[in-house]
Curated annotation (Swiss-Prot):
Disulphide-bridged cysteine pairs: none
Pathway: Cofactor biosynthesis; adenosylcobalamin biosynthesis
Record organism: Bradyrhizobium sp. (strain ORS 278)
Domain GATase cobBQ-type: 252-440
Listed name of the protein: Cobyric acid synthase
Reported function: Catalyzes amidations at positions B, D, E, and G on adenosylcobyrinic A,C-diamide. NH(2) groups are provided by glutamine, and one molecule of ATP is hydrogenolyzed for each amidation.
Length: 495
């Protein structure tokens, strides 16, 4: 028998939908239910590799972990990975099907709904409850036609909806009441309740506000959720959550990450963010690399050539040269590794017009962007120090050259990855997720002279998910949400 389902939509982006689903997934799992997280459509350049070689959004990876379920591409059947202001790579059930501009993607949506529904019903066949996360705002009625992410999906499956508002931004009453006002009557009829997230202060002071929202909308009040400070200990998927400057570092080694416009997979630096022994900073374009930085990291990119141009336009290429002269280290990961080489060639036009561009020339390697995309979990050891690692590959392109003969990493199957130059001052590789490995992270920080905290990152994430579940059990009517969930049915047709 198919699982019951309930959907969580928001009054806007970044109101806490992803963490709400993760926390409820853990809470219901601890109650003994088999939970499946599901997001019909996600837009993110932070992705995770599934066991079958596909990819899903990082938020769904965290939600799967919260539910203690293996990741599957069906948890996020449509993933959009922005490559420009108007276009994205389109991933369907874990596989890239091409690139599309926003206008062209709108025309694709009716065809994509079939994949969305197939994935949803697969999950529902093997769970007690499916927790569905919407995308962006439920009130974007200009996008309602052909919608597969919010009310379009809810209507197709007749899934009840809970709307989440964020009081920390201010105006939460207007946001929730306004959402009800702009929804079409048949969409509004699917909304069963609301939650107010990120409250600070005495909840009694907002009791009248909760009552006012309920009275004006007719929706059930399901909880006023205090701010959960430990949320920072969980991976953040959206660039909205990307931190800026860190606090003054004192004597701590300073590690800077160049946050170019299309940065991807930046969640892999979350373990470093939790280490008190370093001062981690994400530098926005226009911010120079500090003179006292110990390491400058060039992270992954969804549009390597465009971000390399942006790097040069902001003057970071000059800063990197000065940084190296001062004895600082440079690490490139994935797209950042490609930038460190002498040349990046794109003969088939994966990132725009076919052609090639000069790299930074800090590693004697060249990259050719190819059709094949590497998507796999890997393990092995640092080539020089033989420190074990685990991580994942997620890239297009092949990189080779004289410097690659001194690889940064050696895989357990004998393959190698990356390159090292200037006795380790400059290094690059394709593998993401290295800093989640406690042993490798401690080794890397030790070489910087940082005092390590003994952080057990994976255990910390597990404990934080348990804490989030307990937080929601205290402040949310979880049993009420369970009671609202119902088994999916096709939308009734008019006689």
């Amino acid at each position: 028998m198919a699982a019951r389902a309930i959907m969580f939509q928001g009054t806007g982006s970044d109101v806490g939908k992803s963490l709400m689903v993760a926390g409820l997934a853990r809470a219901l799992t601890l109650r003994g239910l088999t939970v499946a997280p599901f997001k019909p459509q996600n837009m993110s350049n932070n992705a995770a590799v599934t066991a079958d070689g596909g990819e899903i959004g990082r938020a769904q990876a965290l939600q799967a972990r919260a539910a203690r379920r293996p990741m599957t591409v069906h948890m996020n059947p449509v993933l959009l990975k922005p490559q420009s202001e108007v276009g994205s790579q389109v991933v369907v059930q874990g596989r890239v099907i091409g690139n599309a501009k926003a206008s062209a993607y709108q025309a694709m949506k009716p065809q994509l709904m079939a994949a969305v529904l197939e994935s949803f019903h697969r999950l529902a066949a093997d769970a007690d409850i499916v927790l569905v996360e919407g995308a962006g705002s439920a009130s974007e009625i200009n996008l309602r036609a052909g919608d597969i992410a919010n009310m379009g999906f809810a209507q197709a499956t007749q899934t009840p909806v809970v709307i989440i508002g964020d009081i920390d931004r201010g105006g939460v009453i207007a946001s929730l009441v306004g959402t009800k006002a702009v929804l079409a009557p048949d969409d509004a009829a699917l909304v069963a309740g609301f939650l107010v997230n990120r409250f600070r202060g005495d909840p009694a002071l907002f009791a009248a506000g909760m009552n006012e929202i309920a009275a004006r909308t007719g929706w059930a009040s399901l909880g006023l959720i205090p701010h959960f400070s430990d949320a920072r200990r969980l991976p953040a998927e959206d660039a909205l959550g990307l931190p800026g400057h860190g606090a003054a570092g004192g004597q701590r080694p300073k590690v800077v990450v160049l946050a170019y416009p299309r940065i991807s997979n930046f969640d892999e630096f979350d373990p470093l963010r939790l280490e008190d022994g370093i001062d981690l900073q994400f530098l926005r374009p226009g911010t120079p690399i500090p003179g006292d930085a110990a390491v400058a990291i060039l992270p992954g990119s969804k549009a390597t050539i465009a971000d390399l141009q942006a790097l040069r336009e902001t003057g970071w290429d000059i800063d990197l040269s000065a940084h190296l002269r001062r004895g600082g280290r440079v690490l490139g990961i994935c797209g950042g590794y490609q930038m460190l080489g002498r040349k990046i060639s794109d003969p088939d036009g994966h990132e725009g017009a076919p052609g090639s561009v000069a790299g930074l020339g800090l590693l004697d390697v060249e990259t050719t962007l190819t059709d094949d995309k590497a998507l796999r979990e890997v393990h092995g050891a640092l080539t020089e120090d033989q420190i074990p690692f685990r991580g994942y590959e997620m890239h297009i392109g092949r990189t080779d050259g004289p410097t690659a003969r001194a690889p940064f990493l050696t895989f357990a199957d004998g393959r190698s990855d990356g390159a090292v130059a200037r006795e380790g001052q400059i290094a690059g590789c394709y593998v993401h997720g290295l800093f989640a490995d406690d042993g490798l992270r401690a080794h890397w920080l030790g070489r910087l002279g940082a005092v390590t905290t003994g952080l057990a990152y994976e255990s910390d994430v597990e404990a934080t998910l348990d804490g989030l579940a307990a937080h929601l059990e205290r402040h949310v009517n979880v049993s009420g949400i369970l009671a609202l969930a119902r088994r999916p049915t096709p939308r009734p047709t008019a006689p």
